[in-house]
């Protein structure tokens, strides 16, 4: 693993620090009038999700870790574990459902997700940015309500509530952004 200087840390870098794997979330490079320059780094632990603020001087060396990204096809869920298949080797692997966090309801059968591995350990999973969902319940449009830009709540088939424009009705398919968990467009 390559070592990098403290001033080379960028957001998104994965670092091995204090016997753990940390993702740099926010990096501020500071050059005070007195003393040496340093990087103030906000980090998130990839194994337990805890946060840490750390200061690295320019001369400090830190291990930068490269995660292996693999496309995996979701097959089914079994007792809180997601069973996925590697799209290249067709090998089946079980992953904890917690890897997806609050985006778990958007996972659909046959969907391809990107899983990040470090030494055969799955640390993170990412859904496609846009997913098609069906609206099962929403309010009817009230005449004259569309004078200003307005939204109404809608319940999706996966149990998630999103705000949609008034022209979208029940039993319609919409595209939802899985990163922001917001309505994107009609499908």
From Swiss-Prot:
Keywords: Cytoplasm, Elongation factor, Protein biosynthesis
A GO term, aspect molecular function: translation elongation factor activity
Its job: Involved in peptide bond synthesis. Stimulates efficient translation and peptide-bond synthesis on native or reconstituted 70S ribosomes in vitro. Probably functions indirectly by altering the affinity of the ribosome for aminoacyl-tRNA, thus increasing their reactivity as acceptors for peptidyl transferase.
Subcellular location: Cytoplasm
SMART domains reported in the protein's UniProt record: EFP (SM01185), Elong-fact-P_C (SM00841)
Protein name: Elongation factor P
Primary location group: cytoplasm
Organism (species): Roseobacter denitrificans (strain ATCC 33942 / OCh 114)
Key word Kinase present: no
InterPro entries per record: Elong-fact-P_C, NA-bd_OB-fold, Rib_uL2_dom2, Transl_elong_fac_P/YeiP, Transl_elong_KOW-like, Transl_elong_P/YeiP_cen, Transl_elong_P/YeiP_CS, Transl_elongation_fac_P
Family: Belongs to the elongation factor P family.
GO CC term, one of those recorded: cytoplasm
GO biological process, one term: peptide biosynthetic process
Pathway: Protein biosynthesis; polypeptide chain elongation
A family per Pfam: EFP_N
